[in-house]
Amino acid sequence: MTLNQLLQKLEATSPILQANFGIERESLRVDRQGQLVHTPHPSCLGARSFHPYIQTDFCEFQMELITPVAKSTTEARRFLGAITDVAGRSIATDEVLWPLSMPPRLKAEEIQVAQLENDFERHYRNYLAEKYGTKLQAISGIHYNMELGKDLVEALFQESDQTDMIAFKNALYLKLAQNYLRYRWVITYLFGASPIAEQGFFDQEVPEPMRSFRNSDHGYVNKEEIQVSFVSLEDYVSAIETYIEQGDLIAEKEFYSAVRFRGQKVNRSFLDKGITYLEFRNFDLNPFERIGISQTTMDTVHLLILAFLWLDSPENVDQALAQGHALNEKIALSHPLEPLPSEAKTQDIVTALDQLVQHFGLGDYHQDLVKQVKAAFADPNQTLSAQLLPYIKDKSLAEFALNKALAYHDYDWTAHYALKGYEEMELSTQMLLFDAIQKGIHFEILDEQDQFLKLWHQDHVEYVKNGNMTSKDNYVVPLAMANKTVTKKILADASFPVPSGDEFTSLEEGLAYYPLIKDKQIVVKPKSTNFGLGISIFQEPASLDNYQKALEIAFAEDTSVLVEEFIPGTEYRFFILDGRCEAVLLRVAANVIGDGKHTIRELVAQKNANPLRGRDHRSPLEIIELGDIEQLMLAQQGYTPDDILPEGKKVNLRRNSNISTGGDSIDVTETMDSSYQELAAAMATSMGAWACGVDLIIPDETQIATKENPHCTCIELNFNPSMYMHTYCAEGPGQAITTKILDKLFPEIVAGQT
């Protein structure tokens, strides 16, 4: 079967860039002095027996971060960024991730084999330590996984003379593997980033600096007698099987090639079930990147892989691959500033890249990538290993690496309430995703704009919207809670205290009600909105003008409006999950405190500068506005936004204390009497709600609440209650909610970890 010139036959509009990607990143845990740690793998990361994203490689201190399959290089890096964020915030606070492929200074006896549950995996690692030594096992890197797109493969198949798709794909991936190994020196030259080994790593003297220790024969390679042919897939499979039978290898995965066929559990299955994708294993960690690999590297490698498919297969595969290995070794061992040797036929690569880009009409971005490759071929200063040279001090990169590790650690803890790469999602969803990754629950974002997730563990699938809307709530429950009139009736029927009042569907009806409430304290609010929108509170009797303004504000949010009695006391939010109160929050209305110098408008701006404040529920606290509601509130107190407040004078900008309208959050879970927590839970249960926010007005929290004498009034129940405000509070310890959501959805994971 010949695949030469097949790519050239495709139409220019063919989906040449279509592919699936995955990244595996290895990294060592070290302390803040750059010394290897001896702590066990973090227990908060769940069981390594099933964790899909965070594992340990050879050593107990060597983390392996594994992305899900992504449809683009950008998404793969986004996944890796999030998993790196989770890993960085799951290890001990005095630990960081080492950003280099070569480990810090170490001794063989320091290296502890990963303490895995699987007996074979432990035995396998002990075997490797005995055979290859433990120091080599501490070398880390990046594995770049790629599957050609389904439509691209189909287009190539249609251009071929083949009738068997599995055989065709096997031949396609075999050709890619052959040319990748033939030209692997390109990867070593461009992206090698392990120019030195720290003192004591090798027993013998080795020349340094070099382009890549890891990608030379000084790195993690098989014994010289292990020679596997890539002439055919059958040859490949049979050779490895023979080495295992002879005892030269203990398992198929002990064959350490720069490229590995993937998609089946055993190699022989490739012959009849097919290769699914390729794993390219020869990438050094890029220490200039927090996640170890840059976007341009990902995309350049993608182009190079396609160029390898564009190029013809070698006529003599074994000879070409042997020459490729020798050239790679020469380039890996050479000084980072040494030009490429004459036998490195860069023109073959450049021509293939140019023709590929031209044939498929790829745009400026990919054309620039090709220009960068050409420039690096001409000037070694532009290669990654050369860029590391200025940071070598006394034959060591330890100081540079530690500074980078600490900087990346600090970045992970910046805006620690968010999930890196997913900051545009609603904050509670980000927190749930963080915990899902940490626990080892598979995830897929079905609709990012709609905050819709698919979570699964083994065969158990759950769908989650907005962080806590799940199958545990039936369809009618959120509808009932969205309707404040229905909520009041259900609670009243269950003998729970609710405020009295009436409902209106027009401004005229509401105004006609004024004579009945003109001397009363009242609340005007939309019937069916959440987050405190459109609510006005009058603790003193309202003038007709202010009452009309409040009605207009409420009608701007809904077609029906409630006018209720004002209940004096302090408002608390109770978070109820599955019949149990998990958190209690005191919310203080949006406010400013004067300093005798600045206007109210300026004080609001100062308070909004707090990094915890943001918009659209993507930060723990919300930006304080100075809109109609706030200015009405100021007017009732005799102020305008441009007035200067006396020092120490506190002015509320809202009467409602929702965090979503600029309020402050104070966690009082530990001090709130359990009687109120139980009462709030009973209210949620009466609604049939699984996840629910219960808002209670409590005049005196020292009084014990009972069903007969509740000493409180329920002013609202909220479906899809915010969770972040209970966790990241302005004051108090905070309560983790999203972890409990996941524990309820996947109790088998909790059981498996205890």
From Swiss-Prot:
Keywords: ATP-binding, Glutathione biosynthesis, Ligase, Magnesium, Manganese, Metal-binding, Multifunctional enzyme, Nucleotide-binding. In the N-terminal section; belongs to the glutamate--cysteine ligase type 1 family. Type 2 subfamily. One of its GO terms (cellular component) is cytosol. One of its GO terms (molecular function) is metal ion binding. It comes from the Bacteria. Binds 2 magnesium or manganese ions per subunit. The keyword Metal-binding applies. Mg(2+) 1 binds at residues 695, 716. Synthesizes glutathione from L-glutamate and L-cysteine via gamma-L-glutamyl-L-cysteine. Pfam families: ATP-grasp_6, Glu_cys_ligase. ATP binds at residues 515-573. This is Glutathione biosynthesis bifunctional protein GshAB. Its EC number is 6.3.2.2, 6.3.2.3. Residues 1-332 are annotated as: Glutamate--cysteine ligase. It is an enzyme of class 6 (ligase). It catalyses: L-cysteine + L-glutamate + ATP = gamma-L-glutamyl-L-cysteine + ADP + phosphate + H(+); gamma-L-glutamyl-L-cysteine + glycine + ATP = glutathione + ADP + phosphate + H(+). Mn(2+) 2 binds at residues 716, 718. SUPFAM superfamilies: Glutamine synthetase/guanido kinase, Glutathione synthetase ATP-binding domain-like. Its cofactor is Mg(2+); Mn(2+). Mg(2+) 2 binds at residues 716, 718. Monomer. Pathway: Sulfur metabolism; glutathione biosynthesis; glutathione from L-cysteine and L-glutamate: step 1/2; Sulfur metabolism; glutathione biosynthesis; glutathione from L-cysteine and L-glutamate: step 2/2. Residues 488-746 form the ATP-grasp domain.
